[in-house]
Amino acid sequence: VKILFFALLALLSGCNGWTNPERAIFEKYHQRLANVLDVPPRELNEVSAITIPDKRALYQELPRLSLGLLESYQLRQCGLFNLIAEKNSQLGKVQDPFHDLDYQTTLLNTLNGCLTEYPLSEDERTTLTRLYEQKWQHLPVHLDNVLLTSETMRKQLTASSWLSAKSRNQTAHVSKTFHALNAMYETPKGVISRLPSFSFVQYQEEMEKSRLMGKVYFTLNSTSEWLDVTTKLLEENQERIVCGKNRDTTQFRYLKNVFQSIYVEEVQPYLAFVDSTYQQLNDGAVLIEQRMELHGESYGVIKAHEQFRTKTLEHVKFWQGLFKRCGVVVGNSPTP
């Protein structure tokens, strides 16, 4: 029974590293350096989960189109009546923002077709022209509701776990979705040919289950924190590090070994992966920040990436300074 108890205790104590191999790399790196320096590891500030403002602070309600004057024969012929009637049905009223965005592009195309291809009375043309202009004005609002308030995107933008190296195949899809949304925002008012011919719903499932942007953001914060405390650990104890001729360089050689075997072989490749993933999502990050700012809110991932770069560079500079002081040229010298 005692053996079973201690085995279970060991298993539980190792769960964090076992379930989170990315964090485990940084824990190992920090602990090994502390061991070599013969000092306790520094206390780490736990990183908060990535959240976004409440949906109510970001959602914008827009008026529904009523059938009103649209019940004429011509408007039935051009497809407008049936399209709006379907939207006003029980199912249409509960469409999520992705489906609603598809409806808005279909509506703009249908309105344009009615105005350009069907004989209309003066009243009908006046009404449809007003609706057409109104729907173009509303398009950025519908896009904001997709980007900032849909359940899909709120899941995509939030996270409390590290970016896994196994998520490489998700990046292209998420990046493509942000590019498509960005292109929609940049569509000139009234230029029907610039509206997408595809359905936005096709992007929904992958965006919802990946949480890629949120994980990148959480990982930028987490790696910045680990690099910061590790750099401080080294800086505060650099007087302990002895090197030079006729000196006992055992400790320095151990540190160099930790640098080579853990930083160069494990930490640095992961940092490069995180940075590369962020770069591929940069257009999406900029778009989110811009649209949040218009609502008086902020997301913060761009600043998190800047901090990540700063902390990485500070850590690299410590090692470069130490190796220079000790007259050592490292084959794979650290790079930011």
What are these regions (language model features)?
Residues 127, 132-284:
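Extended amphipathic alpha-helical interaction segments
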Residues 12-14:
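C-terminal motif of bacterial Sec signal peptides marking the signal peptidase cleavage site
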Residues 16, 79, 115, 242-244, ...:
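Sequence contexts marking disulfide-bonded cysteines in secreted/extracellular proteins
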Residues 276-336:
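Alpha-helical oligomerization segments
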Residues 19-168:
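N-terminal Sec/ER secretory leader and immediately downstream segment
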Residues 1-7:
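Sec-dependent signal peptide recognition
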